[in-house]
Curated annotation (Swiss-Prot):
The gene is gcvPA. This is Probable glycine dehydrogenase (decarboxylating) subunit 1. It comes from Thermococcus kodakarensis (strain ATCC BAA-918 / JCM 12380 / KOD1) (Pyrococcus kodakaraensis (strain KOD1)). The lineage of its organism: Archaea, Methanobacteriati, Methanobacteriota, Thermococci, Thermococcales. It catalyses: N(6)-[(R)-lipoyl]-L-lysyl-[glycine-cleavage complex H protein] + glycine + H(+) = N(6)-[(R)-S(8)-aminomethyldihydrolipoyl]-L-lysyl-[glycine-cleavage complex H protein] + CO2. The glycine cleavage system is composed of four proteins: P, T, L and H. In this organism, the P 'protein' is a heterodimer of two subunits. One of its GO terms (biological process) is nucleoside metabolic process.
Amino acid sequence: MGKHYIPNSAHKDEMLKEIGFSSIEDLFSDVPKGMVKEFNLPEGKSEYEVFTELNETLSKNKTVLEMPSFLGAGTYFHYVPAHVKYLIERSEFLTAYTPYQPEISQGMLQALFEYQSLIAELVGLPIVNSSMYDWGTAMAEAALMSARVTKRNKFVVPKHLSPEKKLVLKTYTAGPGLETVEVPWDERGQMDIEKLKEAVEGAAGVYIEMPNFFGLLEENIREIGEIAHDAGALFVVGVDPTILGIVEAPGELGADIVVGEAAYFGNPMNFGGPRAGIFAVRNDRKLIRQMPGRIIGMTKDADGKRAFVMTLQTREQHIRRAKATSNICSNEALVAVAAAIHLATLGPKGVRELGEVILKNTAYLKKRLAEVGEIVFDGVNFKDVPVRFEVPYSVIHERLLERNIHGGYYIGKHFQELGETALFAATETTRKEWVDGLVDALREIIGEAEL
């Protein structure tokens, strides 16, 4: 044909000629020979050969439909309607581009505005940003924001907090030197109110979750908020939004700031990410001006037509670094749009039904697990249930895997006082036969281990 198409090195040859070299090797000839290494790579393969090899490797993976999973502690199997994936894969949405030019980004900006509106209705607070990276970073940003607003240097959290969230909080607070104080749990697995009263003096903020890391619904959330406010601290509530159809919204319980995980709507597990952190505040100018991230607002253009814009974007790229409230860049907007599509599909009735089904499935899981282990705390559980065993959990987990079942998340390594305890989780996708199969397997494994 007379032309060399793929691979085509003509442009490289032209650049080399322009700078006076005949080859790439000549260009780097001053690099000592001893430092030049050959790539230890196999011979090249055709596209079909690569496809076949990757397909063979990927076929070893198992989905939660093939291998029932009870692994909770923050990542859960929720059903995502097919149209959600279809819509977010449209070219108008599927981009890493941040909509800095509102005149060409009205669709994405409106979708994010709808996300904010839906989350505001869900959490009971009017001001919501267009998402953070995930729940953990949203919580950590809330700690920093509390310190900026109150001019204090201490943030109070429950000891029974996700180990991953603790690490994120530690990372965020290390630079500014913000002290974090942990309040222990009581015999019910809930924040110890008396210990909180001792710890809250001089605090910038007090943080609590609904449900907590043990899957329990904290019964004293309103009282915790009052204790925080009496001490001059902000009250921060972290929430799993799938519960908000069946419990009172945190904004109605006195929360100043609400954080959480939006990716539980509209997004698959994806090995734990990407996510989208919820961040909402009450309508207070002091709080709004200190919010991290970006807020999408609705206004009118020069012709009087409705338009969507970035109302607040107090990032260090836009204003003086010392005045910036965050350095969040191209964040999890697509994940937030997916959450908005799913939420709009469910509506208030669907969100309530989702919460009811999860609560029912969790209760059945808890009832059956009580037959083979000790339910550590008495209370109402949502998704997660902590169960203690007499047999080392590492043995139980390994043998469950041999039976094609993924067991719970071992928390004894993080909370040694709980011993051989694991968190088992249920969602709306958990089938009765999966739970029955799990309990039968546990009974058999424990029996074998005790022989």
